[in-house]
Amino acid sequence: MAVPGSFPLLVEGSWGPDPPKNLNTKLQMYFQSPKRSGGGECEVRQDPRSPSRFLVFFYPEDVRQKVLERKNHELVWQGKGTFKLTVQLPATPDEIDHVFEEELLTKESKTKEDVKEPDVSEELDTKLPLDGGLDKMEDIPEECENISSLVAFENLKANVTDIMLILLVENISGLSNDDFQVEIIRDFDVAVVTFQKHIDTIRFVDDCTKHHSIKQLQLSPRLLEVTNTIRVENLPPGADDYSLKLFFENPYNGGGRVANVEYFPEESSALIEFFDRKVLDTIMATKLDFNKMPLSVFPYYASLGTALYGKEKPLIKLPAPFEESLDLPLWKFLQKKNHLIEEINDEMRRCHCELTWSQLSGKVTIRPAATLVNEGRPRIKTWQADTSTTLSSIRSKYKVNPIKVDPTMWDTIKNDVKDDRILIEFDTLKEMVILAGKSEDVQSIEVQVRELIESTTQKIKREEQSLKEKMIISPGRYFLLCHSSLLDHLLTECPEIEICYDRVTQHLCLKGPSADVYKAKCEIQEKVYTMAQKNIQVSPEIFQFLQQVNWKEFSKCLFIAQKILALYELEGTTVLLTSCSSEALLEAEKQMLSALNYKRIEVENKEVLHGKKWKGLTHNLLKKQNSSPNTVIINELTSETTAEVIITGCVKEVNETYKLLFNFVEQNMKIERLVEVKPSLVIDYLKTEKKLFWPKIKKVNVQVSFNPENKQKGILLTGSKTEVLKAVDIVKQVWDSVCVKSVHTDKPGAKQFFQDKARFYQSEIKRLFGCYIELQENEVMKEGGSPAGQKCFSRTVLAPGVVLIVQQGDLARLPVDVVVNASNEDLKHYGGLAAALSKAAGPELQADCDQIVKREGRLLPGNATISKAGKLPYHHVIHAVGPRWSGYEAPRCVYLLRRAVQLSLCLAEKYKYRSIAIPAISSGVFGFPLGRCVETIVSAIKENFQFKKDGHCLKEIYLVDVSEKTVEAFAEAVKTVFKATLPDTAAPPGLPPAAAGPGKTSWEKGSLVSPGGLQMLLVKEGVQNAKTDVVVNSVPLDLVLSRGPLSKSLLEKAGPELQEELDTVGQGVAVSMGTVLKTSSWNLDCRYVLHVVAPEWRNGSTSSLKIMEDIIRECMEITESLSLKSIAFPAIGTGNLGFPKNIFAELIISEVFKFSSKNQLKTLQEVHFLLHPSDHENIQAFSDEFARRANGNLVSDKIPKAKDTQGFYGTVSSPDSGVYEMKIGSIIFQVASGDITKEEADVIVNSTSNSFNLKAGVSKAILECAGQNVERECSQQAQQRKNDYIITGGGFLRCKNIIHVIGGNDVKSSVSSVLQECEKKNYSSICLPAIGTGNAKQHPDKVAEAIIDAIEDFVQKGSAQSVKKVKVVIFLPQVLDVFYANMKKREGTQLSSQQSVMSKLASFLGFSKQSPQKKNHLVLEKKTESATFRVCGENVTCVEYAISWLQDLIEKEQCPYTSEDECIKDFDEKEYQELNELQKKLNINISLDHKRPLIKVLGISRDVMQARDEIEAMIKRVRLAKEQESRADCISEFIEWQYNDNNTSHCFNKMTNLKLEDARREKKKTVDVKINHRHYTVNLNTYTATDTKGHSLSVQRLTKSKVDIPAHWSDMKQQNFCVVELLPSDPEYNTVASKFNQTCSHFRIEKIERIQNPDLWNSYQAKKKTMDAKNGQTMNEKQLFHGTDAGSVPHVNRNGFNRSYAGKNAVAYGKGTYFAVNANYSANDTYSRPDANGRKHVYYVRVLTGIYTHGNHSLIVPPSKNPQNPTDLYDTVTDNVHHPSLFVAFYDYQAYPEYLITFRK
């Protein structure tokens, strides 16, 4: 029957009718594999009726279903091939039952069949792998089945290896090692041999027993019993005996009846014993899973006590960790003793375990160590028990013992029972002390604790019965009590009393029986109260000594040792003496004053204090004198210039020490004495010429140095003090014997002349006269100048007495006290400026810097430090570390640079230096942009000096660099930063700035001094910080200080008391505009505050100005009456009250000037104008006013000044939106957009019609707002008017009168009338519309010009006395723009001068091209070069001879040059600048005479010759320019070029006109010109001008009316010029020839040519027309001769006789062009020079001789006819007025070259 609960499948395969042997096993393995077949647990049975078929029984049905669902099944059998399997459900259940029946039958007979030996192939098939267990061997006889195939070798030694056993078995059995397995079990000292092939194991054992090797190895072989027990391992949790029994009895698992189950849960294993041994074969071959956990099954042999694992290693499971608990105190104890824990850990490791100590509780976790695996299974089983036993043994060495103790008792004794050997802990809840530690320690300490408890208990009882008292006694008084016998006496009388002293609380504690305590307290108090004290003054040196010694020890030495019961203590700066009695106090004072002393030793050379000898001496002295206690101290003061040693202490020791140290210093100190010898020339003379003196000095060990480095010029003597002083006297005697004289010369070039051959001249003077000579340089920089060779760019006054100088020069050679070096953080001077300074300074500078870094660390950017200067000529060098530039951190870089500069200035101030030089820090390798760098440095300097009111030691700050680019950047930065100030002009080196002229106000930056001596200072700071005697404050009428920003800032600093006092002062006073109240200053830095009620501006009303003037004057009067020195005014009224800032600045300064001039001031010296640094407008206004007055622009007492034309038109400003304002003379002129009817003024002007009743535009608005009364008044006055205007009342408008003018009339005339009318009525303000721009339709530009012109005329005539302000109110914004443009056009200009008719005429005639005023501005700089020579010699005679020789030499070298030329008059700014440059670069002096005109040059010959060439080139250039200008004038007379712009034609200027005409005549296609300052190209073909942007203008050429060309001229064929040769038959030829031949008949005429030059002809005729008109009936024209050379002919033909020919061949009668009456004069070879072919040329010329007079050689223009009228000149000059033979013409176009005669001899 079928297996219950199984699900069968029928399997057929491709193996045929005779299936292979063991196929059953292969199929079972295949279908058991889920991976190969999809199956699982199953059983395979062969169908007995059909051996080729098999039935597979699956237990879970779903497993069978999976096998069915898999389509292909293949069984791969190695060596036999692959078999295809077919699976299907069985046909009927009977078929299955039949299989089981057949199996039972075959089972019984199976062992009887096939007894014969199987063949080899069959034997191989029966072998199964060891790890799957062993199948029973086939074909084994039944009687052998109970004989074991396993042999055990017991008593296995450790030295027997598995190889040895295998070899033994092979030798004894004769089998190969493939036929058996050897398994060594070291835990039991046994090895088991399992035979794979059937042998006679009994015989094998017997053979082994006899084998000699077995005997030698002492092995005990025996036949291992056949077992029916298995060991099952890897059991899952939850298994038990019953479930295991059921599992292994299940046939599905291959099991059978179980005899016994022994389960080992801790090992997850069990022993299963079966009744039937054969079951083992099935189970061992079956793969078992228990609760889805795969099981490991091994045969178990009881005789061995273990299972056989075969090739598998036994699964050894280590025991689980377990915990042990320690007593908590013991655990705490061990936690504090790490070494004990380590000892326990080490001991437990021997038990193969590891301990983990809990950090929170007394738990110890014990885990098996990895080494336990090697100890074997028996040891593993007993591991936990063994470990617990060992730990218990260790724990027994320690003890925890509690002791019952009261908490109060414990607090008392706990500090006495501390012992590090054990843990002592108090349990508050249990009131027990717990002792934990090693047993012996705990027992020992327990005894001590119990004894301490007992003794303490008794002590507490005694204390409860005793008394404790505290007394406050100072340490000093306690010191005296201790040294008196009182305390010892008390302790003797009262032995039970305790006396102790707490120095911290200064309490003296008495403890003991109450009677004893009270007695002791009374006696101590009595003693303390009788003590006496006294403060005495001692010197600072002695006080310092007492500070350094211990007062107790020194009091014992000073007082107690002398039996004086006293002590000293330091109290503040005095010494407090305390004694037990007044008598002892007197003795103590006497003792202190007599026993202590100090002495000083001045040390000139500090180096002596740094030597080892000095250090050793002072050390030994201090050691000797201060053995105990200290009796002397030695202080070395080396920070000052001269060092000092102070010895302080006990008199005897001080005297001894002083004597020794003084002698040492005198004997070892070297000193220097510099004998300053001036001039330095004397030093050279003494050094060379007085050689006999120096060896005498050197014999006494005094070193002599001439002109030592880094010191003043002189002779330095170095040596011992006595010898040096003697040597100084010798040097002075020698010096006095020398004669020195200086000679000064102002000959130009003298200095350079000497310098060129200085060595030669010096050697000659020495050879000839025995003297020394030198050129005296500026040794000391004069005020305003700079050192020699260093260029000063600017000077700016920073503060009174402090100047900022920008100068180009070498930072290592400057006349300053200290310089700033741009350094890096490490003060390593590797490159750039730092390297240059370091090289000049020598190694001392770098060494000192290294010490600074070592001492103070690296310097961070933004810091500065100071070091020695080494060999540099400075006291110190300041090293400033600037930042490295980063664009991302620019603000930080600027901050750091600013900080570095300011710290450098602070260091200079700290060391009391007067001058400092600063370079462009960080601008080099640190990459700081130069512009940003210099601006930051200048700003930092400005802040340091201008915003700090404290006094400054620094008086000169130099900004220096060798690079001109850097210095220029510095100068520009100074100009920018100080733009509101007027810097001094940079004076040339060595020259002081010009002093202010008499009557002018002296001016420094922010400073003015009035003629009366009152100083005015411009101070930029808040009013609350003012430090003057008096401060002025602006307050409202209610006197509330918190309402205004000015008074509020004062109130905040002064405190509320200021308001309270002001209220008190104001009571009973009628406060109104102009009231001045005086109060105290309270917390302010001044002495008094003057509170003023300032007026509102009210458009500049007279009353407001008057009140403000009265306020200012009264404040100064109060200051003077209080006998105070200074007063400070803020810009009162310029804020909410509306005073314009520039008007207030002018008003207050004017009032101060007036007050100073009218009063004899006794005490008032300074008036400060306080301006907040952020109030830039007020600062600018005051700075402008300061600068204006400093320039001599002093105004009168009144604010306006009519006649001052300096800067007649002021600058245009915009005080409010839509308002523009400027000064016109003394009048404030405003234009504003708005409604005129809302304005407030003395007069409002109405622009109306002829009938004065216009009801349109502005007139309508004015009449309607003014009211009906004004209209009626207009009607009445219109009928009776005598002028073009009428005056009515103001009506409802805010004015006194309305002046009605006619808008269509002349606007300038109308405004002038209004101004005059207002002046008559003393009105100060006028408001008018843009007259005529409405219905009269006048152009706004013309109206604006007319109004401004009217005001200008009014002011210029001096009429403006009352009128202060004129305001134009405009309705239309475009009209406002026109007015603004007109104001800007006149901004900053002066009055225009009017040109007279005569001057215009003179200009036309060529007398003058420029006004003389302009030339007066061109002044040739006066060069005052001088040289001073210093001569040194033996006596006066030698020196004077040498001076005379030098003067003669210089005089001979001087070379003069003179040039007299008319063109010198035409020199303009360019020529003057060139002349000035010549003076600068050459050793010459140039003087200029404008009248002659004449240039004189004086200097050394080579420079004079160079100047001559350049001056003559200048004259030639000017002459050519004038010729061009003359041509331009000529051309412009009849040709005019114009361009058209916006349909308006504009003329080109005359030079451009000439340029265009020349280009046209030269037939150029294009020419470049300028139109309105833009470049245009004119196309002469299309007549268009095009600019660079393509914008085009049309151009045209106009021909003016001109003189007709002579009719006899030949056709010029559109040429501008031609020469026509005349035929001898022409009448013209004959006429000219006959005239020539009258005096030149001996010459042969080759040809006569007519010159046809229309331009020259027109110019000549125009000049003739003018002369004819001027001279009336005079015959103005003559035909004369003029001889010339061939080279001049082309020029004359084209240009005529212009000024370039003036004086060319003669100057006897003037420097003009000469024309002769007779031809023979001109034909002379002097004038008509023959060419190479012998041809000569003479012109027959038309000359305008006009009215003439006698000439002379000095004339460059004709003389005047009348001395009273210098512009009315003669036309020409002649040699003889009555019989002239020649004429001299001076002007262009005064002659026309009509005919050219070519002839030869």
Swiss-Prot record:
A glycoprotein 1 binds at residues 824, 833, 922-926, 961. ADP-ribosyltransferase that mediates mono-ADP-ribosylation of glutamate residues on target proteins. In contrast to PARP1 and PARP2, it is not able to mediate poly-ADP-ribosylation. Has been shown to catalyze the mono-ADP-ribosylation of STAT1 at 'Glu-657' and 'Glu-705', thus decreasing STAT1 phosphorylation which negatively regulates pro-inflammatory cytokine production in macrophages in response to IFNG stimulation. One of its GO terms (cellular component) is cytoplasm. A glycoprotein 2 binds at residues 1023-1024, 1034, 1046-1049, 1133-1137, 1175-1178. It comes from Homo sapiens (Human). Its main location: nucleus. This is Protein mono-ADP-ribosyltransferase PARP14. SUPFAM superfamilies: ADP-ribosylation, Macro domain-like, WWE domain. Residues 791-978, 1003-1190, 1216-1387 form the Macro domain. Keywords: ADP-ribosylation, Cytoplasm, Glycosyltransferase, Immunity, Innate immunity, NAD, Nucleotidyltransferase, Nucleus, Phosphoprotein, Repeat, Transcription, Transcription regulation, Transferase. CDD domains: Macro_Af1521_BAL-like, Macro_BAL-like, RRM1_PAR14, RRM2_PAR14, TCCD_inducible_PARP_like. One of its GO terms (molecular function) is NAD+-protein-glutamate ADP-ribosyltransferase activity.
